[in-house]
Protein backbone atom coordinates (compact mmCIF):
# COMPACT_ATOMS: atom_id res chain seq x y z
CA UNK A 1 0.00 0.00 0.00
CA UNK A 2 1.88 3.10 -1.19
CA UNK A 3 1.42 6.32 0.81
CA UNK A 4 3.18 9.62 1.43
CA UNK A 5 2.66 9.26 5.16
CA UNK A 6 0.68 11.46 7.56
CA UNK A 7 -1.53 8.40 7.94
CA UNK A 8 -5.12 8.77 9.12
CA UNK A 9 -8.28 6.66 9.35
CA UNK A 10 -8.71 6.76 5.58
CA UNK A 11 -5.38 4.99 5.16
CA UNK A 12 -6.32 2.74 8.06
CA UNK A 13 -9.50 1.60 6.35
CA UNK A 14 -7.48 0.57 3.30
CA UNK A 15 -4.96 -1.26 5.51
CA UNK A 16 -7.74 -3.12 7.30
CA UNK A 17 -9.38 -4.18 4.03
CA UNK A 18 -6.06 -5.31 2.58
CA UNK A 19 -5.06 -7.22 5.71
CA UNK A 20 -7.98 -9.59 5.14
CA UNK A 21 -6.11 -10.82 2.07
CA UNK A 22 -2.67 -11.26 3.65
CA UNK A 23 0.26 -9.38 5.24
CA UNK A 24 0.23 -5.68 4.36
CA UNK A 25 3.35 -3.60 3.70
CA UNK A 26 2.73 0.14 3.96
CA UNK A 27 5.30 2.32 2.23
CA UNK A 28 5.83 5.92 3.34
CA UNK A 29 7.65 8.04 0.78
CA UNK A 30 7.12 11.72 -0.03
CA UNK A 31 7.78 11.54 -3.74
CA UNK A 32 9.52 14.65 -5.12
CA UNK A 33 8.61 13.80 -8.71
CA UNK A 34 4.90 14.42 -8.18
CA UNK A 35 5.23 17.93 -6.75
CA UNK A 36 5.30 21.03 -8.94
CA UNK A 37 7.73 23.94 -8.37
CA UNK A 38 5.22 25.97 -6.33
CA UNK A 39 3.63 23.09 -4.44
CA UNK A 40 4.01 21.91 -0.86
CA UNK A 41 6.87 19.40 -1.06
CA UNK A 42 8.90 21.15 1.64
CA UNK A 43 6.04 21.43 4.13
CA UNK A 44 4.16 18.22 3.36
CA UNK A 45 3.32 16.58 6.73
CA UNK A 46 5.97 14.11 7.87
CA UNK A 47 5.24 12.12 11.03
CA UNK A 48 6.94 8.74 10.84
CA UNK A 49 6.52 7.83 14.52
CA UNK A 50 2.80 8.54 14.35
CA UNK A 51 2.57 6.64 11.05
CA UNK A 52 4.07 3.57 12.71
CA UNK A 53 1.40 3.67 15.41
CA UNK A 54 -1.45 4.13 12.92
CA UNK A 55 -0.20 1.40 10.57
CA UNK A 56 0.17 -1.11 13.40
CA UNK A 57 -3.20 -0.22 14.93
CA UNK A 58 -5.03 -0.87 11.63
CA UNK A 59 -3.29 -4.18 10.96
CA UNK A 60 -0.23 -3.55 8.79
CA UNK A 61 2.48 -6.19 9.01
CA UNK A 62 5.30 -3.74 8.29
CA UNK A 63 6.01 -0.13 7.38
CA UNK A 64 8.81 0.81 4.99
CA UNK A 65 10.09 4.38 4.74
CA UNK A 66 12.79 4.41 2.04
CA UNK A 67 15.02 7.37 1.30
CA UNK A 68 15.03 9.30 -1.97
CA UNK A 69 18.38 7.66 -2.76
CA UNK A 70 16.90 4.20 -2.37
CA UNK A 71 14.00 4.94 -4.69
CA UNK A 72 15.91 7.08 -7.17
CA UNK A 73 19.59 6.05 -7.12
CA UNK A 74 20.21 8.28 -10.14
CA UNK A 75 18.60 11.31 -8.56
CA UNK A 76 15.05 12.28 -7.76
CA UNK A 77 14.82 15.75 -9.19
CA UNK A 78 14.68 14.54 -12.79
CA UNK A 79 14.58 10.75 -12.81
CA UNK A 80 15.89 9.48 -16.17
CA UNK A 81 13.31 6.71 -16.50
CA UNK A 82 10.18 8.76 -15.81
CA UNK A 83 7.11 7.00 -17.23
CA UNK A 84 4.74 9.05 -19.36
CA UNK A 85 1.02 8.68 -18.66
CA UNK A 86 -1.15 8.71 -21.82
CA UNK A 87 -2.35 12.28 -22.47
CA UNK A 88 -6.00 11.24 -22.46
CA UNK A 89 -5.81 10.07 -18.85
CA UNK A 90 -4.31 13.31 -17.52
CA UNK A 91 -5.77 15.93 -19.85
CA UNK A 92 -8.65 16.65 -17.47
CA UNK A 93 -9.28 16.94 -13.73
CA UNK A 94 -6.10 17.23 -11.63
CA UNK A 95 -3.81 16.38 -14.52
CA UNK A 96 -4.65 19.62 -16.34
CA UNK A 97 -3.71 21.81 -13.38
CA UNK A 98 -0.69 19.78 -12.24
CA UNK A 99 1.47 19.04 -15.31
CA UNK A 100 3.88 16.17 -14.68
CA UNK A 101 2.17 15.16 -11.44
CA UNK A 102 0.84 11.81 -12.62
CA UNK A 103 4.04 11.03 -14.50
CA UNK A 104 5.74 11.32 -11.12
CA UNK A 105 3.11 9.14 -9.45
CA UNK A 106 3.42 6.27 -11.92
CA UNK A 107 7.21 6.49 -11.88
CA UNK A 108 7.43 6.05 -8.12
CA UNK A 109 4.79 3.30 -8.03
CA UNK A 110 6.62 1.44 -10.79
CA UNK A 111 9.78 1.60 -8.67
CA UNK A 112 7.89 0.37 -5.61
CA UNK A 113 6.42 -2.53 -7.58
CA UNK A 114 9.88 -3.49 -8.80
CA UNK A 115 11.38 -3.36 -5.33
CA UNK A 116 8.55 -4.96 -3.34
CA UNK A 117 6.98 -7.31 -5.94
CA UNK A 118 3.57 -7.43 -4.24
CA UNK A 119 0.65 -9.63 -5.24
CA UNK A 120 -1.85 -6.81 -4.74
CA UNK A 121 -1.80 -3.01 -4.80
CA UNK A 122 -4.33 -1.38 -2.48
CA UNK A 123 -5.47 2.21 -3.01
CA UNK A 124 -8.24 4.56 -1.94
CA UNK A 125 -10.93 5.76 -4.33
CA UNK A 126 -10.65 9.35 -3.06
CA UNK A 127 -8.25 10.26 -5.87
CA UNK A 128 -10.19 8.43 -8.58
CA UNK A 129 -8.02 9.77 -11.40
CA UNK A 130 -4.90 8.41 -9.71
CA UNK A 131 -6.59 5.02 -9.23
CA UNK A 132 -7.50 4.82 -12.93
CA UNK A 133 -3.98 5.81 -13.95
CA UNK A 134 -2.35 3.24 -11.66
CA UNK A 135 -4.60 0.55 -13.09
CA UNK A 136 -3.32 1.63 -16.50
CA UNK A 137 0.27 1.43 -15.20
CA UNK A 138 -0.07 -2.16 -13.97
CA UNK A 139 -1.56 -3.22 -17.32
CA UNK A 140 1.05 -1.23 -19.25
CA UNK A 141 3.91 -2.89 -17.38
CA UNK A 142 2.17 -6.30 -17.55
CA UNK A 143 2.78 -6.78 -13.83
CA UNK A 144 1.04 -9.77 -12.16
CA UNK A 145 -0.50 -7.41 -9.61
CA UNK A 146 -4.17 -7.06 -8.68
CA UNK A 147 -5.25 -3.45 -8.07
CA UNK A 148 -7.88 -3.03 -5.36
CA UNK A 149 -9.76 0.17 -4.55
CA UNK A 150 -11.45 1.08 -1.27
CA UNK A 151 -14.30 3.60 -0.91
CA UNK A 152 -13.55 7.15 0.19
CA UNK A 153 -13.63 7.58 3.96
CA UNK A 154 -15.33 10.74 5.23
CA UNK A 155 -15.75 12.76 8.39
CA UNK A 156 -19.19 13.03 9.98
CA UNK A 157 -19.90 16.20 7.97
CA UNK A 158 -18.90 14.54 4.69
CA UNK A 159 -15.40 15.94 4.22
CA UNK A 160 -13.11 13.34 2.67
CA UNK A 161 -10.17 12.42 4.89
CA UNK A 162 -6.88 13.78 3.58
CA UNK A 163 -3.41 14.35 5.00
CA UNK A 164 -3.65 17.95 3.80
CA UNK A 165 -6.74 18.62 5.94
CA UNK A 166 -4.38 19.38 8.81
CA UNK A 167 -3.36 22.57 6.97
CA UNK A 168 -6.87 23.96 7.55
CA UNK A 169 -7.57 26.48 10.31
CA UNK A 170 -10.71 25.88 12.42
CA UNK A 171 -12.67 28.36 10.30
CA UNK A 172 -11.39 26.82 7.07
CA UNK A 173 -12.23 23.35 8.34
CA UNK A 174 -15.83 24.41 8.90
CA UNK A 175 -15.89 25.97 5.45
CA UNK A 176 -14.42 22.84 3.83
CA UNK A 177 -17.57 20.86 4.63
CA UNK A 178 -19.35 22.89 1.94
CA UNK A 179 -17.41 20.98 -0.76
CA UNK A 180 -19.00 17.54 -0.23
CA UNK A 181 -22.32 19.20 0.57
CA UNK A 182 -22.34 21.01 -2.79
CA UNK A 183 -21.34 17.84 -4.66
CA UNK A 184 -24.13 15.90 -2.99
CA UNK A 185 -26.69 18.61 -3.83
CA UNK A 186 -25.56 18.66 -7.47
CA UNK A 187 -26.71 15.06 -7.92
CA UNK A 188 -30.34 16.06 -7.52
CA UNK A 189 -32.58 17.21 -10.35
CA UNK A 190 -31.02 15.71 -13.49
CA UNK A 191 -30.05 19.06 -15.09
CA UNK A 192 -26.46 19.95 -16.01
CA UNK A 193 -24.81 19.96 -12.58
CA UNK A 194 -21.66 21.89 -13.47
CA UNK A 195 -22.90 25.53 -13.49
CA UNK A 196 -24.84 25.12 -10.26
CA UNK A 197 -21.96 23.34 -8.54
CA UNK A 198 -19.44 25.94 -9.62
CA UNK A 199 -21.76 28.67 -8.34
CA UNK A 200 -22.33 26.93 -5.02
CA UNK A 201 -18.60 26.48 -4.44
CA UNK A 202 -17.85 30.12 -5.29
CA UNK A 203 -20.65 31.30 -3.01
CA UNK A 204 -19.16 29.21 -0.19
CA UNK A 205 -15.92 31.16 -0.50
CA UNK A 206 -13.76 28.65 -2.37
CA UNK A 207 -11.42 29.50 -5.21
CA UNK A 208 -12.58 26.99 -7.82
CA UNK A 209 -9.85 25.26 -9.82
CA UNK A 210 -12.12 22.97 -11.81
CA UNK A 211 -15.55 21.38 -11.89
CA UNK A 212 -15.84 18.59 -14.45
CA UNK A 213 -18.00 15.61 -15.31
CA UNK A 214 -16.17 12.67 -16.86
CA UNK A 215 -16.56 9.03 -17.74
CA UNK A 216 -15.11 7.14 -14.73
CA UNK A 217 -13.27 4.69 -16.98
CA UNK A 218 -11.85 6.90 -19.75
CA UNK A 219 -11.72 10.17 -17.77
CA UNK A 220 -13.14 11.97 -20.80
CA UNK A 221 -15.88 14.64 -20.50
CA UNK A 222 -19.40 13.25 -20.72
CA UNK A 223 -23.04 14.04 -20.09
CA UNK A 224 -26.25 12.17 -19.39
CA UNK A 225 -25.51 9.74 -22.21
CA UNK A 226 -23.13 8.09 -19.75
CA UNK A 227 -25.22 6.20 -17.20
CA UNK A 228 -22.57 6.39 -14.48
CA UNK A 229 -20.34 9.46 -14.45
CA UNK A 230 -17.87 11.16 -12.12
CA UNK A 231 -18.59 14.72 -11.02
CA UNK A 232 -15.32 16.06 -9.64
CA UNK A 233 -14.11 19.34 -8.22
CA UNK A 234 -10.88 20.89 -6.96
CA UNK A 235 -10.92 24.06 -4.87
CA UNK A 236 -8.68 26.20 -2.74
CA UNK A 237 -9.75 26.68 0.84
CA UNK A 238 -7.35 29.39 1.87
CA UNK A 239 -4.03 28.04 0.57
CA UNK A 240 -5.08 24.39 0.92
CA UNK A 241 -6.08 22.47 -2.19
CA UNK A 242 -9.01 20.11 -1.69
CA UNK A 243 -10.39 17.56 -4.15
CA UNK A 244 -13.57 15.54 -4.00
CA UNK A 245 -16.11 13.86 -6.25
CA UNK A 246 -19.55 12.30 -6.45
CA UNK A 247 -20.92 9.69 -8.80
CA UNK A 248 -23.97 10.55 -10.90
CA UNK A 249 -26.16 7.62 -11.93
CA UNK A 250 -29.06 7.88 -14.39
CA UNK A 251 -29.75 4.23 -13.57
CA UNK A 252 -28.21 1.50 -11.47
CA UNK A 253 -25.29 -0.57 -12.83
CA UNK A 254 -25.97 -2.95 -15.71
CA UNK A 255 -23.69 -5.88 -16.58
CA UNK A 256 -23.89 -8.04 -19.72
CA UNK A 257 -22.17 -11.42 -19.80
CA UNK A 258 -22.21 -13.30 -23.10
CA UNK A 259 -20.51 -16.45 -24.26
CA UNK A 260 -20.98 -19.85 -25.87
CA UNK A 261 -22.81 -22.80 -24.39
CA UNK A 262 -21.05 -24.56 -21.53
CA UNK A 263 -18.79 -21.65 -20.60
CA UNK A 264 -20.17 -21.60 -17.06
CA UNK A 265 -22.03 -18.32 -17.46
CA UNK A 266 -25.04 -19.24 -15.32
CA UNK A 267 -23.01 -20.49 -12.36
CA UNK A 268 -20.61 -17.57 -12.13
CA UNK A 269 -23.15 -14.90 -13.06
CA UNK A 270 -25.50 -16.01 -10.30
CA UNK A 271 -22.69 -15.89 -7.73
CA UNK A 272 -21.35 -12.60 -9.12
CA UNK A 273 -24.80 -11.02 -8.85
CA UNK A 274 -25.19 -12.18 -5.25
CA UNK A 275 -21.72 -10.90 -4.36
CA UNK A 276 -22.49 -7.38 -5.63
CA UNK A 277 -26.16 -7.12 -4.74
CA UNK A 278 -27.33 -7.19 -8.36
CA UNK A 279 -30.41 -8.96 -9.68
CA UNK A 280 -29.52 -12.05 -11.72
CA UNK A 281 -31.34 -12.23 -15.06
CA UNK A 282 -30.81 -15.72 -16.47
CA UNK A 283 -31.82 -15.19 -20.09
CA UNK A 284 -30.61 -18.67 -20.97
CA UNK A 285 -33.22 -20.09 -18.60
CA UNK A 286 -35.84 -17.99 -20.35
CA UNK A 287 -34.96 -19.49 -23.75
CA UNK A 288 -34.81 -22.95 -22.24
CA UNK A 289 -38.26 -22.33 -20.76
CA UNK A 290 -39.71 -21.56 -24.19
CA UNK A 291 -37.95 -24.63 -25.59
CA UNK A 292 -39.41 -26.81 -22.85
CA UNK A 293 -42.89 -25.48 -23.64
CA UNK A 294 -42.38 -26.12 -27.37
CA UNK A 295 -41.39 -29.74 -26.71
CA UNK A 296 -44.13 -30.19 -24.11
CA UNK A 297 -46.75 -29.09 -26.65
CA UNK A 298 -45.30 -31.36 -29.32
CA UNK A 299 -44.33 -28.50 -31.62
CA UNK A 300 -41.39 -28.82 -34.02
CA UNK A 301 -38.53 -26.64 -32.66
CA UNK A 302 -37.74 -25.57 -36.23
CA UNK A 303 -41.30 -24.36 -36.96
CA UNK A 304 -41.40 -20.69 -36.01
CA UNK A 305 -44.94 -20.24 -37.30
CA UNK A 306 -46.20 -22.96 -34.96
CA UNK A 307 -44.19 -21.61 -32.03
CA UNK A 308 -45.43 -18.02 -32.26
CA UNK A 309 -48.94 -18.68 -30.82
CA UNK A 310 -47.34 -20.21 -27.72
CA UNK A 311 -45.73 -16.86 -26.92
CA UNK A 312 -48.95 -14.84 -26.64
CA UNK A 313 -49.83 -15.98 -23.13
CA UNK A 314 -46.33 -17.02 -22.09
CA UNK A 315 -45.48 -16.19 -18.48
CA UNK A 316 -41.87 -16.92 -17.50
CA UNK A 317 -40.94 -16.13 -13.90
CA UNK A 318 -37.43 -16.30 -12.44
CA UNK A 319 -37.27 -16.38 -8.66
CA UNK A 320 -34.29 -16.51 -6.31
CA UNK A 321 -34.67 -18.95 -3.45
CA UNK A 322 -32.53 -19.15 -0.28
CA UNK A 323 -29.06 -20.50 -0.89
CA UNK A 324 -28.75 -18.93 -4.33
CA UNK A 325 -31.09 -21.49 -5.93
CA UNK A 326 -33.09 -20.26 -8.92
CA UNK A 327 -36.67 -21.37 -9.49
CA UNK A 328 -38.07 -21.16 -13.02
CA UNK A 329 -41.83 -21.13 -13.56
CA UNK A 330 -43.54 -21.41 -16.95
CA UNK A 331 -47.21 -20.47 -16.77
CA UNK A 332 -47.08 -21.32 -13.08
CA UNK A 333 -45.37 -24.71 -13.44
CA UNK A 334 -41.96 -25.30 -11.84
CA UNK A 335 -39.61 -26.39 -14.65
CA UNK A 336 -36.31 -25.61 -12.91
CA UNK A 337 -34.91 -29.11 -13.49
CA UNK A 338 -36.78 -29.94 -16.69
CA UNK A 339 -35.23 -27.08 -18.66
CA UNK A 340 -31.75 -28.55 -18.05
CA UNK A 341 -32.56 -31.89 -19.70
CA UNK A 342 -30.54 -33.11 -22.72
CA UNK A 343 -33.65 -32.84 -24.94
CA UNK A 344 -34.05 -29.16 -24.13
CA UNK A 345 -30.31 -28.58 -24.53
CA UNK A 346 -30.39 -30.17 -27.98
CA UNK A 347 -33.28 -27.99 -29.17
CA UNK A 348 -32.76 -24.62 -27.49
CA UNK A 349 -30.51 -23.24 -30.22
CA UNK A 350 -33.14 -23.93 -32.90
CA UNK A 351 -35.93 -22.38 -30.83
CA UNK A 352 -33.85 -19.33 -29.85
CA UNK A 353 -33.05 -18.65 -33.51
CA UNK A 354 -36.66 -17.74 -34.33
CA UNK A 355 -37.27 -14.02 -34.62
CA UNK A 356 -40.62 -14.25 -32.80
CA UNK A 357 -39.00 -15.92 -29.79
CA UNK A 358 -36.10 -13.49 -29.53
CA UNK A 359 -38.31 -10.45 -29.99
CA UNK A 360 -40.76 -11.61 -27.31
CA UNK A 361 -38.07 -12.37 -24.75
CA UNK A 362 -35.91 -9.36 -25.63
CA UNK A 363 -38.84 -7.04 -24.87
CA UNK A 364 -39.26 -8.71 -21.47
CA UNK A 365 -35.54 -8.55 -20.75
CA UNK A 366 -35.20 -4.88 -21.69
CA UNK A 367 -38.13 -4.05 -19.46
CA UNK A 368 -36.50 -5.91 -16.57
CA UNK A 369 -33.24 -4.01 -17.09
CA UNK A 370 -34.61 -0.51 -17.72
CA UNK A 371 -33.65 0.68 -14.23
CA UNK A 372 -30.40 -1.30 -14.08
CA UNK A 373 -29.25 -3.01 -10.94
CA UNK A 374 -28.89 -6.35 -12.67
CA UNK A 375 -26.53 -8.67 -14.46
CA UNK A 376 -27.78 -10.68 -17.43
CA UNK A 377 -26.12 -13.57 -19.21
CA UNK A 378 -26.82 -15.10 -22.59
CA UNK A 379 -25.62 -15.04 -26.19
CA UNK A 380 -26.52 -11.51 -27.35
CA UNK A 381 -26.94 -9.48 -24.16
CA UNK A 382 -24.18 -7.00 -24.93
CA UNK A 383 -25.07 -6.66 -28.61
CA UNK A 384 -28.88 -6.82 -28.74
CA UNK A 385 -30.46 -6.64 -25.28
CA UNK A 386 -28.28 -4.22 -23.29
CA UNK A 387 -25.87 -2.60 -25.78
CA UNK A 388 -25.26 0.25 -23.30
CA UNK A 389 -24.31 -1.98 -20.36
CA UNK A 390 -21.63 -0.53 -18.07
CA UNK A 391 -19.61 -3.74 -18.25
CA UNK A 392 -19.67 -6.30 -21.05
CA UNK A 393 -17.82 -9.58 -20.70
CA UNK A 394 -17.49 -12.40 -23.22
CA UNK A 395 -17.02 -15.45 -21.01
CA UNK A 396 -15.63 -18.44 -22.87
CA UNK A 397 -13.55 -21.61 -22.64
CA UNK A 398 -12.19 -24.14 -25.10
CA UNK A 399 -14.53 -26.83 -26.47
CA UNK A 400 -12.55 -29.46 -24.55
CA UNK A 401 -13.01 -27.64 -21.26
CA UNK A 402 -16.70 -27.01 -21.87
CA UNK A 403 -17.27 -30.69 -22.70
CA UNK A 404 -15.61 -31.66 -19.42
CA UNK A 405 -17.87 -29.28 -17.49
CA UNK A 406 -20.98 -30.47 -19.34
CA UNK A 407 -20.23 -34.10 -18.52
CA UNK A 408 -19.83 -33.24 -14.84
CA UNK A 409 -23.08 -31.25 -14.85
CA UNK A 410 -25.04 -34.10 -16.47
CA UNK A 411 -23.63 -36.59 -13.99
CA UNK A 412 -24.54 -34.40 -11.02
CA UNK A 413 -28.09 -33.97 -12.35
CA UNK A 414 -28.57 -37.70 -12.83
CA UNK A 415 -28.64 -37.74 -16.64
CA UNK A 416 -26.79 -40.18 -18.89
CA UNK A 417 -23.34 -38.87 -19.87
CA UNK A 418 -22.34 -39.30 -23.55
CA UNK A 419 -18.78 -40.03 -24.62
CA UNK A 420 -16.49 -37.01 -24.37
CA UNK A 421 -15.96 -36.89 -28.15
CA UNK A 422 -19.72 -36.82 -28.69
CA UNK A 423 -20.11 -33.99 -26.19
CA UNK A 424 -17.34 -32.01 -27.89
CA UNK A 425 -19.04 -32.50 -31.26
CA UNK A 426 -22.38 -31.36 -29.83
CA UNK A 427 -20.83 -28.25 -28.31
CA UNK A 428 -18.94 -27.38 -31.50
CA UNK A 429 -22.17 -27.76 -33.50
CA UNK A 430 -24.04 -25.59 -30.99
CA UNK A 431 -21.36 -22.92 -31.39
CA UNK A 432 -21.75 -23.08 -35.17
CA UNK A 433 -25.52 -22.78 -35.01
CA UNK A 434 -25.45 -19.95 -32.48
CA UNK A 435 -22.83 -17.92 -34.35
CA UNK A 436 -24.33 -18.32 -37.84
CA UNK A 437 -28.04 -17.90 -37.15
CA UNK A 438 -29.70 -14.95 -38.86
CA UNK A 439 -31.43 -13.57 -35.79
CA UNK A 440 -29.09 -12.19 -33.08
CA UNK A 441 -26.11 -14.50 -33.64
CA UNK A 442 -23.62 -15.22 -30.89
CA UNK A 443 -20.84 -12.67 -31.14
CA UNK A 444 -18.55 -10.71 -28.90
CA UNK A 445 -19.51 -7.04 -28.60
CA UNK A 446 -16.80 -4.67 -29.82
CA UNK A 447 -16.40 -3.20 -26.33
CA UNK A 448 -16.67 -6.49 -24.44
CA UNK A 449 -13.74 -7.95 -22.54
CA UNK A 450 -12.94 -11.57 -23.35
CA UNK A 451 -12.39 -13.76 -20.29
CA UNK A 452 -11.10 -17.26 -21.10
CA UNK A 453 -11.77 -19.45 -18.07
CA UNK A 454 -9.74 -22.59 -18.82
CA UNK A 455 -7.83 -23.50 -15.67
CA UNK A 456 -9.87 -21.12 -13.49
CA UNK A 457 -12.16 -22.32 -10.73
CA UNK A 458 -15.47 -20.59 -10.05
CA UNK A 459 -14.06 -18.34 -7.32
CA UNK A 460 -11.26 -17.13 -9.60
CA UNK A 461 -13.72 -16.26 -12.36
CA UNK A 462 -15.96 -14.39 -9.92
CA UNK A 463 -13.00 -12.41 -8.57
CA UNK A 464 -11.99 -11.49 -12.13
CA UNK A 465 -15.52 -10.27 -12.86
CA UNK A 466 -15.62 -8.24 -9.64
CA UNK A 467 -12.34 -6.53 -10.53
CA UNK A 468 -13.65 -5.65 -14.00
CA UNK A 469 -16.83 -4.28 -12.43
CA UNK A 470 -14.91 -2.15 -9.92
CA UNK A 471 -12.83 -0.61 -12.71
CA UNK A 472 -16.08 0.90 -13.98
CA UNK A 473 -18.28 1.21 -10.90
CA UNK A 474 -16.71 2.55 -7.71
CA UNK A 475 -17.36 1.03 -4.32
CA UNK A 476 -18.69 4.42 -3.26
CA UNK A 477 -21.23 4.40 -6.12
CA UNK A 478 -22.41 0.80 -5.61
CA UNK A 479 -21.24 -0.56 -2.23
CA UNK A 480 -20.63 -4.27 -1.86
CA UNK A 481 -23.34 -5.71 0.42
CA UNK A 482 -22.17 -6.71 3.87
CA UNK A 483 -22.21 -10.48 4.33
Curated annotation (Swiss-Prot):
Its EC number is 6.3.2.1, 2.7.4.25. The active site is at 11 (proton donor). ATP binds at residues 4-11, 124-127, 153, 161-164. Beta-alanine binds at residue 34. InterPro entries: Cytidylate_kin, Cytidylate_kinase_dom, P-loop_NTPase, Pantoate_ligase, Pantoate_ligase/cytidylate_kin, Pantoate_ligase_C, Rossmann-like_a/b/a_fold. Disulfide bonds: none annotated. GO terms for molecular function: ATP binding; CMP kinase activity; dCMP kinase activity; pantoate-beta-alanine ligase activity. It catalyses: (R)-pantoate + beta-alanine + ATP = (R)-pantothenate + AMP + diphosphate + H(+); CMP + ATP = CDP + ADP; dCMP + ATP = dCDP + ADP. Residues 247-483 are annotated as: Cytidylate kinase. It comes from the Bacteria. SUPFAM superfamilies: Nucleotidylyl transferase (SSF52374), P-loop containing nucleoside triphosphate hydrolases (SSF52540). (R)-pantoate binds at residues 34, 130. It is found in: Cytoplasm. In the N-terminal section; belongs to the pantothenate synthetase family. NCBIfam families: cmk, panC, PRK13477.1. Catalyzes the condensation of pantoate with beta-alanine in an ATP-dependent reaction via a pantoyl-adenylate intermediate. Catalyzes the transfer of a phosphate group from ATP to either CMP or dCMP to form CDP or dCDP and ADP, respectively. This is Bifunctional pantoate ligase/cytidylate kinase. The lineage of its organism: Bacteria, Bacillati, Cyanobacteriota, Cyanophyceae, Synechococcales.
Amino acid sequence: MPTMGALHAGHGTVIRAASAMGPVLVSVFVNPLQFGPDEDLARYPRSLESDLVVAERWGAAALWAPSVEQIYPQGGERHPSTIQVPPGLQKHLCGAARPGHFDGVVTVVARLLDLVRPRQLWLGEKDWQQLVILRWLVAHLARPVIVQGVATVREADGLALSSRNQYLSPDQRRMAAALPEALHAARGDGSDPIPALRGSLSDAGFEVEYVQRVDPCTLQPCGDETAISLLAAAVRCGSTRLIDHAFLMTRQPLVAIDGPAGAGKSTVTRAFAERLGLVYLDTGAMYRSVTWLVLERGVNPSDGVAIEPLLKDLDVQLQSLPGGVQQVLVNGEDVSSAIRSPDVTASVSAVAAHRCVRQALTVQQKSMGSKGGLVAEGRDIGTAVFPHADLKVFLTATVTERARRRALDLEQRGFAVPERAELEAQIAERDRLDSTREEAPLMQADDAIELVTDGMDIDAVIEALVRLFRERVAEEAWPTPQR
